[in-house]
Amino acid sequence: AAVHAAAILLLPQLERGQRVDASVLRSAMESAFGASDASGAWDWKTAYDACEAATVLFMRKYGKSLLRRAGSPAALLPLLGKIVGLLPTQTRRSEESQAFQQFSTPISLGIAAVTAAAITPTDRVLEPSAGTGLLAILAEIAGGSLVLNELAELRAGLLSLLFPAEPVTRFDAAQ
């Protein structure tokens, strides 16, 4: 729940087109968790998850109108590139991220995948390793209904908050 709270705190930065630097991110995380990373309450990989969750919230709020305004998925890419460019690069890893092999789908690849899949409202989209929901939100914007799965406990909990209408399963998708 604290990661989600941090994402909500970061969303206005994205809405204003303001960069989320390390100090802004640290402030949001400390406010949401009530403690610093030095205390062990959170790590930087969790902070990056909060940034991705803020992107999901941004896309849910503005994604459809941005796509309409852009006219095509290809024309949407530069707009989304500007949003993603406001976020810090993910330079730090955690033991959990290595153990679960957590690698986020870049939004440009997500747009390509959703476009290639030609998702319609009649499609049910399975996201077997949904992470923070970056690919799932694009499928949702395209009109597909979602089936979400995430093994990692923190990310599964975050998905439940980001996609409250969708159940989140916790199977090992690698098996």
Mark where each language-model region is.
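Class I S-adenosyl-L-methionine-dependent methyltransferase catalytic core
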Residues: 1-175
